[in-house]
Amino acid sequence: MLVVLLTAALLALSSAQGTDEEVNNAETSDVPADSEQQPVDSGSDPPSADADAENVQEGESAAPANEEPPATSGSEEEQQQQEPTQAENQEPPATSGSEEEQQQQEPTQAENQEPPATSGSEEEQQQQEPTQAEDQQPPATSGSEEEQQQQESTQAENQEPSDSAGEGQETQPEEGNVESPPSSPENSQEQPQQTNPEEKPPAPKTQEEPQHDSGRPKKPLLPFIANLIRERIRKLLARSPLGRRF
């Protein structure tokens, strides 16, 4: 922008100087013409008129010669100076800056693209493969085998007491189906005295069974206790002489 403004100012100055010189030359050319025409009008000799005409022609030829150089010299020299300066201002940045930046960017881009693709990805993959293998192998051997062993042991423990409990339950209903003989008032008085010490031991058995079968639902205790009491009463009646009478 500064270069363009300077060139415009110089052109304006040169045009102004050219117009001033043209005006001065025109004034100088008009003055001798008037001086030469005066003797012609006064009636001078023909040879003097011819000489005046030649002088006028020489003055006219000299005037354009004086007019041309400033117009050509100033503007042409300024234009010739401006052209190389403009070419210098325009060409170097286009060639030097862009080409150098492109040449610098190409190797930097190649360096940025190539190394991570070869070094980073391969090293990370190589590191991830052994770590994944280490993470996968130990739990398969340690955790699963230990859990299976624990489950098998717990299942075996849970099955054994259940079998024993099932056998006891199967035998109980068979005895409960036996009809009890009618009891007399004397037997009714003797029964609570004989059954009180024997009713206490079965209570802890019922409390211990749920401990073995913790995972299974608890069974009602009242019918189980009632069946035990009936069995004890029948056994006592069978042993006592009063029960044999009836």
Curated annotation (Swiss-Prot):
Residues of the signal peptide: 1-18
Biased composition (Basic and acidic residues): 197-216
A GO molecular-function descriptor: hydroxyapatite binding
Stretch list, region Disordered: 14-223
Localization annotation: Secreted
Stated role: GRP proteins have a marked affinity for hydroxyapatite. They may play a role in the formation of the protective acquired pellicle at the saliva-tooth interface.
Listed name of the protein: Submandibular gland secretory Glx-rich protein CA
Gene name of the encoded protein: Grpca
